[in-house]
UniProtKB/Swiss-Prot annotation:
Protein's name according to its UniProt entry: Chaperone protein DnaK
Source species: Solidesulfovibrio magneticus (strain ATCC 700980 / DSM 13731 / RS-1)
One Gene Ontology molecular-function label: unfolded protein binding
Biological function: Acts as a chaperone.
PROSITE patterns, sorted: HSP70_1 (PS00297), HSP70_2 (PS00329), HSP70_3 (PS01036)
Any one Pfam family match given in the protein's UniProt record, by short name: HSP70
């Protein structure tokens, strides 16, 4: 069995580690670098890494960088539209509405471009080890959703790698940090890389790494800081020369290179100068750029970006049930944490000096290699407990999002719950799988849908539909539904290539807080409607069964109150519906007594489950778990 390599597939740079005995070692590339630029260029041949980066200025439209930002995203996502304004290569709508890149008329999915980078890393590892490499552990941002994780796994498969495990980047970093540490510590891993930001709260020590909570922003990173510098340089040049460089792709590529360099220099220097001769030309001749940037100016340009990291930190601590003072160490990961303003912000929030004992560019790959060693059996007695970043569940009666698995649940995990039907003789139920934090289904993100068909004729509320969610150690979701009466079962593996955009993810959680009161009212209204609907159904059924056995006065009184409930259900006034329902409930007590007497005389017993969901959707309660059988389903993009 060959080595399992650990890969940090980064937005800006990627890194590979491998276990040699009990020690993780960095795999250097043929150019001598410990990290490889995540860049692919198309010329007469395909270039990857440093060689692709070097020719980017003269080949901007065919040089693809930061492809990770498009992984699992739809073309019409706000982040993709924003990215379109800043990148020189062409982004187009691909299969199923996904964001693809186009080079010389050919479309490439983000997974394909990522696979080219992974292929280069695989080749470098084989050259370093002197043996074939077929297995890998690949890291992803903790806040990557199911589709983005699946796309990453697909990229590995395209590159000829069996992805043994998808591991969260902050978790990998903590694994490397906590490797061989005996003392128990509560740590925060603050990971600000080239394209994404993650914060994870963990407990490490005595060979156990347990994630308590995670949060983040999958569209915040060094690329955004670079864009602020580029925009500043473009504005300064326009003020001085009256020429707008924002539409000049070659000039923008030079500015990107210079802006990134200036940003890095200002982490150690107080001032730097961007000097770009022959940046453009007009009728009067060639133009040169010479702009001085101070550290203070840079910090004023990116201050709001740095502040965006604070709220996820606050949420992660709250989810973990901890205060900032409870954290023993704050570990900095990702190149952007070298920026003084970032480390200062971290120190102010957590009230302690950040821990700089790990290499922020390599620690994630190191942790991935350690995880590879655990899977291969080379690293003993290390237990890693990770979590799922967002809640998962299904849509139930009235458009309510019923959670089966809460966010920050330790994975792998499996959860089942029993639901029922909403209509008499309902032949099928539609299972609408969702991910998010809002109470209402349409405020969350659809992962997929599938049908459980062939239900035998039965009154509403009688069928028992057991829905099971299964999340594996990679964070990838499987859902099944089983009719416990007939044993019929169908399932879906959530494999949609398009995923949640960062705006969607943030909307899910931020809206959940800012609209908490509104959500509460909506949910209360749905519950009251469900109660009223159930009471109307059972009352009408009882009236029909009793027939002539009920006197006209009682029947008239009940029917009047029944019609009143139906009228209030046409509106949105929860109080009015509740009052009408309470009136009907009191009036129908007599009816229930008569029905009970009738059943007793016939030797039968009243009862049966209450009604559940509407429109072919499931309705409500709990249950066990079973094996899964594949079935056809509609993939939602």
């Amino acid at each position: 069995m060959g080595k399992i390599i650990g890969i940090d597939l980064g937005t800006t740079n990627s890194c590979v580690y491998v276990m040699e005995g009990k020690d993780p070692k960095c795999v250097t590339n043929p150019e001598g670098g410990r990290t490889t630029p995540s860049i692919v260029a198309f010329t007469k041949e395909r270039l990857v890494g440093e060689i692709a980066k070097r020719q980017a200025v003269t080949n901007p439209e065919r040089t693809i960088f930061a492809i990770k930002r498009l992984m699992g995203r739809r073309y019409d996502a706000p982040e993709v539209k924003h990215w379109l304004e800043h990148c020189p290569y062409k982004i187009v709508e691909g299969q199923g509405g996904d964001a693809y890149v186009e080079v010389e008329g050919k479309k490439y999915s983000p997974a394909e471009i990522s696979a080219i980078i992974l292929g280069k890393l695989k080749k470098d590892a084989e050259a370093y080890l002197g043996e074939p490499v077929t297995e890998a552990v690949i890291t992803v941002p903790a806040y990557f959703n199911d589709a983005q994780r699946q796309a990453t796994k697909d990229a590995g498969r395209i590159a000829g790698l069996e992805v043994k495990r998808i591991i969260n980047e902050p978790t990998a970093a903590s694994l490397a940090y906590g490797f061989d540490k005996k003392a128990n510590e509560k740590i925060a891993v603050f990971d600000l890389g080239g394209g994404t930001f993650d914060i994870s709260i963990l407990e490490v020590g005595d060979n156990v790494v347990e994630v308590r909570a995670t949060n983040g922003d999958t569209f915040l990173g060094g690329e955004d800081f670079d864009h602020r510098v580029i925009s500043y340089l473009v504005d300064e040049f326009k003020k001085e020369n009256g020429i707008d460089l924002s539409q000049d792709r070659m000039a923008l590529q030079r500015l990107k290179e210079a802006g990134e360099k200036a940003k890095k220099e200002l982490s150690t220097a107080m001032e730097t100068e961007v000097n770009l001769p022959f940046i453009t030309a007009d009728a009067s001749g060639p133009k040169h750029m010479m702009v001085k940037i101070t550290r203070g100016k840079l910090e004023s340009l990116v201050d709001d970006l740095v502040k965006r990291t604070v709220e996820p930190c606050r949420k992660a601590l709250a989810d973990a049930g901890l205060k900032a003072s409870d954290i023993d160490e704050v570990v900095l990961v990702g190149g952007m944490t070298r920026m003084p303003l970032v480390s200062k912000t971290v120190q102010e929030f957590f009230g302690k000096e950040p821990n700089r004992s790990v290499n922020p560019d390599e620690v994630v790959a190191m942790g991935a290699a350690i995880q590879g060693g655990i899977l291969a059996g080379d690293v003993k007695d290390v237990l890693l407990l990770d979590v799922t970043p967002l809640s998962l569940g299904i849509e139930t009666l009235g458009g309510v999002f019923t959670k089966l698995i809460e966010r920050n649940t330790t994975i792998p995990t499996r959860k089942s719950q029993v639901f029922t039907t909403a209509a008499d003789n309902q032949p099928s139920v539609s299972i609408h799988v969702l991910q998010g934090e809002r109470p209402m289904a349409n405020d969350n993100m659809t992962l997929g849908r599938f049908e459980l068909t062939g239900l035998p004729p039965a009154a509403r509320g009688i069928p028992q539909i057991e829905v099971t969610f299964d999340i594996d150690a990679n964070g990838i979701v499987n859902v099944s539904a089983k009719d416990t009466g007939t044993g019929k079962e169908q399932s879906i593996r959530i494999t949609a290539s398009s995923g949640l955009s960062e705006a969607d993810i943030q909307k899910l959680i931020k809206d959940a807080e800012s609209h908490a009161e509104d959500d509460k009212k909506k949910q209360a209204l749905i519950e009251i409607r469900n109660q009223a609907d159930t009471l109307v159904y059972t009352t009408e059924k009882s009236l029909a069964e009793l027939g002539e056995k009920i006197d006209g006065v009682t029947r008239g009184e009940i029917e009047a109150k029944l019609n009143n409930v139906k009228e209030t259900l046409k509106g949105e006034d929860a109080d009015a519906i509740k009052r009408a329902t309470d009136d009907l409930s009191q009036a129908s007590h007599k009816l229930a007594e008569k029905l009970y007497q009738q059943k007793a005389e016939e030797g039968g017993q009243p009862g049966g489950p209450q009604a559940g969901a509407a429109g072919g959707q499931p309705g409500a309660k709990a249950g066990g778990d079973d094996d899964v059988v594949d079935a056809d389903y509609t993939e939602v993009k």
